């Protein structure tokens, strides 16, 4: 199966927020509609700190990828972090995720992004095999700690 990947804009807000709500419910994340809107609206309006790509047909997307950007001394420039990736359950395991990440990687590389990272959570994450298959490698040099500033 082949899926188009298109950068989402403000006209995609309703569908993006709906897909995000499904992902957050599936992952049992505590985010509400107000939080999702606060996160997505700036990116859909073109904020350079991140982007959302819709997967599949524009009228009925199959999922989305949300990437945030950061500057990396180690990489020598801009890097992307996959904050969220979601695919409707009915279309999973058909190669669409692989195609999607390839298309997003090509677009980011063309835009000068040096590396694309994904926080995969626990070492026993069932998606680890997927990440390895699509070319991501474990980074044993990095552990992340966080100070919540707001």
Predicted regions and their residues:
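Acetyl-CoA-dependent GNAT
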Residues: 7-77, 83, 107, 138-140, ...
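Residue-level recognition of the GNAT/N-acetyltransferase active site
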Residues: 70, 88, 121
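Conserved acetyl-CoA-binding loop-helix of GNAT-fold acetyltransferases
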Residues: 87, 93-106, 133
């Amino acid at each position: 199966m082949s899926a188009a990947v298109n950068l989402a804009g403000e006209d995609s807000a309703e569908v993006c927020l709906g897909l995000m709500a499904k992902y957050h419910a599936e992952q049992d994340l505590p985010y509400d509609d107000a939080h999702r809107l606060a996160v997505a609206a700036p990116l859909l309006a073109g904020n350079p700190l991140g982007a959302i790509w819709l997967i599949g047909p524009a009228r009925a997307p199959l999922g989305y990828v949300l990437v945030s950007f950061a500057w990396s001394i180690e990489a020598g420039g801009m890097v992307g972090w996959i904050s969220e990736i979601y695919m409707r359950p009915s279309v999973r395991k058909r190669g669409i995720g692989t195609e999607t990440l390839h298309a997003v990687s090509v677009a980011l590389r063309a835009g000068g992004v040096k590396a694309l990272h994904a926080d995969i959570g626990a070492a026993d994450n069932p998606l680890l095999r997927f990440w390895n298959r699509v070319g991501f490698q474990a980074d044993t040099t990095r552990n992340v700690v966080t100070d919540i500033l707001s």
